[in-house]
Amino acid sequence: MSLQTASKVWKGSTTSNALGMFGTGFLVLGILGMAVSFASDVKHFWHAYLVMFMFLLSLGLGALFYLALEYLVGAYWSVPIRRVTEGVAGLLIPVAFLSIPIFMGGMDHLYSHWIPHHAHHAEGHAHHGEEHDKHKAKVDKYQKSDSNTYSDKAKDHKHKSSDAYGGHHEPDPIVEGKRPFLSKPWFYVLNIGCFLIWIAFFYWFRNNSREQDKDGSQKYTQRNVIMSAPFMLVFAATLTIAAIYYMMSLEPHWFSTMFGIYYFAGTLVSAASILTILVITLHQNGFLHSQMKKDTYYSLGLMMFAFNVFWAYISFSQFMLIWYANLYEETMWFIYRYEGGWATVSWFLILFHFVIPFFALLSRDQKTNPSRLIFMAYWLLAAHILDLYWIIVPTYAETSFQLSDLGFLIFAAGFVMFFFNSGVKGANLVPIKDPKLEHGLEFKIH
């Protein structure tokens, strides 16, 4: 069978049309659910929106990293599934538009603790006083339980980070020290710049890949290889900037030099998981090359396993370093996540995100069983969402989930279905004239 005729055409297929329709339906249902959330609790709405935004961003960034990594290391096994990776990386374009609501309306609710007083909405002042009282109670509790550790530091940090610009308090010196970085203009410029860089690299990699379908020239591969190395350096910087601005700045008193790589580890897990779901589903329905072996499934399962272990390693390392240093500014971040219902979530996250997936993906048989791989891929996507929820929501709430949060999950599912389908319509789902395709199809695990 010819390498160029061994898969179905995606564009115009029944599956493509169905995916587009389901995606549209899920988007509509998700918007309705999000509207209910906005009407019931504006503050919670914006924090749940940020969770959804960072989740969708992680899918696109992780796929873009895998795309560049393939060229950088000269991988063969991933060539037959490259168009799927390109389709997921293409989510970065519509995700960029999801940042606009945060810029226009969400910042005053999410980052009011470092936005100057004149930029606040009126209702923010009452919230600051409430946050101050909650934080003071926590400080008093931990001062009493470990006065030698916290008493001196607590005197200098009487207010929670979100009280930095409260209506009745002086500007916070810690926030003021970070003022050149924590400002709306820099937030806009740096984050818009990050998206422009990511999208520019994405178009470079994808366009060269698609141009190769016309004449099979090796020059297109070489162009991407040359660009992949500098991309890695730029990617590390821009991803860290995004993680700091969107999530770490929710609590500007807290800082961690490992936070960027912590989010990066999550993007690798989530992107590997969504790629596993899409690749297996498309292959089983005849849209990827028929000669592709289950060894490709094994590689995807290995990526999920390895990068999830990497996530656990980074998570534990960050916790251990903060626990060992025992600095008030750092430890309070974990204390907030061990208060109220968040203590249960914290322990559950360890089990749900690491322990169970570790044993479920440990054996070779598990990594070559399509149905089990898809199940674990969905599991890890849910674990990544929980991780983001655990990072973001405790910054303002002592309780966790709300029923209206389902609207954000439905919207995210529809978003992926609709825009992935739209993004891969313009080309073959297999890079039919890539010189490495045949080697990729012959790939076997030894």
Language-model-detected regions and their locations in the chain:
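Juxtamembrane membrane-water interface segments of multi-pass membrane proteins
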Residues: 2-18, 36-42, 66-89, 102-116, ...
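Long, contiguous internal "core" modules enriched in hydrophobic/ aromatic residues
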Residues: 16-31, 123-134, 138, 148, ...
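Loop-to-transmembrane alpha-helix initiation sites
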Residues: 398-412
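N-terminal regions that are enriched for targeting/export leaders
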Residues: 1-60, 157-160, 179, 426, ...
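Aromatic-anchored segments of alpha-helical transmembrane domains
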Residues: 237-241, 378-389
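Hydrophobic cores of alpha-helical transmembrane segments in multi-pass inner/ER membrane proteins
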Residues: 59-66, 97-98, 191-202, 265-280, ...
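Transmembrane-helix bundle segments that line or gate the permeation/cavity pathway
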Residues: 46, 58-146, 150-160, 164-213, ...
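Hydrophobic core of alpha-helical transmembrane segments in multi-pass integral membrane proteins
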Residues: 20-39, 99, 236-239, 354-358, ...
